Amino acid sequence: MNIDNELSKCRNIGIMAHIDAGKTTTTERILFYTGKQNRIGEVHEGAASMDWMEQEKERGITITSAATTCFWNGHRINIIDTPGHVDFTIEVERSLRVLDGAVAVFDGVAGVEPQSETVWRQADKYNVPRICFMNKMDRMGADFYRCVDMLVDRLGATPLVLQLPIGSEKDFVGVVDLLEMRSIIWDEDSLGASFHYGEIPKDMIDKAQEYRNKLLESAVELNDEAMNLYFEGKEISVSLLKSCIRTGVIQSKFVPVLCGSAFKNRGVQPLLDAVVDFLPAPNDIPVIEALDVKTSNTINVKTSAGGKFVALAFKVMTDKFVGSLTFIRIYSGKLSSKTTVLNAVKDSTESIGRILLMHANNREDITEAQAGDIVALAGLKKTVTGDTLCALDYPVILERMEFPEPVMEIAVEPKSTADQEKMGIALSRLVAEDPSLGMYVNPESGQTILKGMGELHLEVIVDRMRREFNVEANIGAPQVAYRETITKSVEIEYIHKKQTGGAGQFAKVNILFEPLPPGSGFQFESKITGGAIPKEYIPGVQSGLENIRGSGMLAGFPVIDFKATLFDGAFHEVDSSPLAFELAAKGAFRDMVNKAGAILLEPIMKVEIITPDEYMGDVIGDINSRRGRVAEMQDRHNTKVILAFIPLAKMFGYVKDLRSMSQGRAQYSMYFSCYEQVPDNIVANEIKTK
């Protein structure tokens, strides 16, 4: 078989959704029906094969993205099952970066939930084509048509409905296939493995024809032949219609919508058909952009197994049997064991030992992998998440991933001297695995501080230290990761001069500091012309600003959302050095503090609360007492859905308070929204200087 024909038979997909929408249950059914496993693992029994960590089995949630491979209709499908909890959103981010397509799973009752919006935006960022699966159609309150409307209202998506549910809630038995215009009914006694086709129920014929017409109108626009047949009133073949839909999905014109109940074993096989029929193969995305290290130009890397080897490392983890495992997605060329490749980011080489295909935490050794493959490499020494591996004679760097800022901190202290050394090793490995986890030592207290995405994230990290590394630690109360920024533009001229008898130090910098929109981070630009400062000294200025902004201006918190433009300066032939310019930059930063209107920022969380009507007044009153603001209220069956924005500082222990207010009947979910200024009247009470 031609190599690129093999590529066309490959699908790299992710399963993504809000927590409890049924991602892992859907994946377990896929593995069962494709013959990858001979039994169905249930999440609620702690037996799901994709949830292999002890914490995942105990909590019934997915924490780490797990990879596996299965086969369907002659196609190989590489699947990554990702977490739905906001605290583990980094796992979704790095998975979507290397996937060609995604299946977005929605709860048929709740529809589009907060984390659904987050993962949808992440998929938009990486232009990942996707299909939607409306799950849990058997549950009380499930409403397929309302969920489709929510795709438009909440996500701005263009849904292309391919199926309609037959029956609702406990009477849900199958679907109407709008492509073939027939019904599909699943047999109860075969665990969903067998099903039969039939006529569309009479009471659904009109609705099926209505949605079939909508489907045709959207799909034929992408193919002249299909459009001509449509306007001539002639029949369009299913194969031509599928080709139109595939084109539209790959171009992100619309998202096909299917439905079912993974737990009740209905709807999964047509979902697999849709993955094969509509989601792109690696070679459907013909080129990816990369930076040519030699020329610093942007070049296109062709997606082909016949090209030079190029891969992106998207995850590092520690395996207790194999040691360090680095997951890579190969975009071009082939990789064989016992060869040497270049890490273009680190400008160092890595020796390739074992190449592994993963099924959750089970491993299969292979000797070669090629473009389109997602594999794990054992024993790499220097490669971390986001690094590019490539052929020795083809140094290129692929676009790196963006990782969210940690919003919560805890102090971690080893319980004994024996735990001290082990804790250092454990934390360095865990931080290497998880780019959304940070660590630093408080210079005043000497405490080790862990930074993470939320209480659950940090709780799981501490639990992993204990289980995997035998480290016992005392944990401090969670603290908010505040930030600082500036509100005014200011130009600073600073001269650093030091004379000590021998060679001295001299550097002069003129820097414009400007505030940037929220979420911009720190930006540095040099506008030096005419040799006012030699090129080799400019990185010292950037380094100095990077270092000092981390220790803050007001209360010791990192400074974000500002730009520093180096526009002039001076140097001395003998006394200037990179260090002198680094110190000058730090001096300029300190001078800027009192002139640029420095303020404190706090993380604001987007919170969705679902509560019975009778508790709504208490819940809203409590939101107001937490300095929160209610943005939206909706009716959902017999409950109220409240969307609010609340400072993270006021959310500690909220789960207990909400249970108490509602007698355990209300629930909530939250995720990071943005940083906002801390009101002046509460700064002194809420912030303690580091």
Curated annotation (Swiss-Prot):
Main location: cytoplasm
PANTHER family, sorted: RIBOSOME-RELEASING FACTOR 2, MITOCHONDRIAL, TRANSLATION ELONGATION FACTOR G-RELATED
GO molecular function, a single term: translation elongation factor activity
GO biological process: ribosome disassembly
Protein's organism: Ehrlichia canis (strain Jake)
Domain tr-type G per the UniProt entry, residue ranges: 8-283
Pfam families listed in its UniProt record: EF-G_D2, EFG_C, EFG_III, EFG_IV, GTP_EFTU
Family: Belongs to the TRAFAC class translation factor GTPase superfamily. Classic translation factor GTPase family. EF-G/EF-2 subfamily.
Compartment annotation: Cytoplasm
Gene3D superfamilies associated with the record: 3.30.230.10, 3.30.70.240, Elongation Factor G (Translational Gtpase), domain 3, P-loop containing nucleotide triphosphate hydrolases, Translation factors
Domain of life, per lineage: Bacteria
Summary of the function given for this chain in its UniProt record: Catalyzes the GTP-dependent ribosomal translocation step during translation elongation. During this step, the ribosome changes from the pre-translocational (PRE) to the post-translocational (POST) state as the newly formed A-site-bound peptidyl-tRNA and P-site-bound deacylated tRNA move to the P and E sites, respectively. Catalyzes the coordinated movement of the two tRNA molecules, the mRNA and conformational changes in the ribosome.
GO cellular component: cytoplasm
Binding site for GTP: 17-24, 81-85, 135-138
Keyword tags: Cytoplasm, Elongation factor, GTP-binding, Nucleotide-binding, Protein biosynthesis
PROSITE patterns noted in UniProt: G_TR_1, G_TR_2
Protein name as it appears in the record: Elongation factor G
HAMAP family: EF_G_EF_2_B
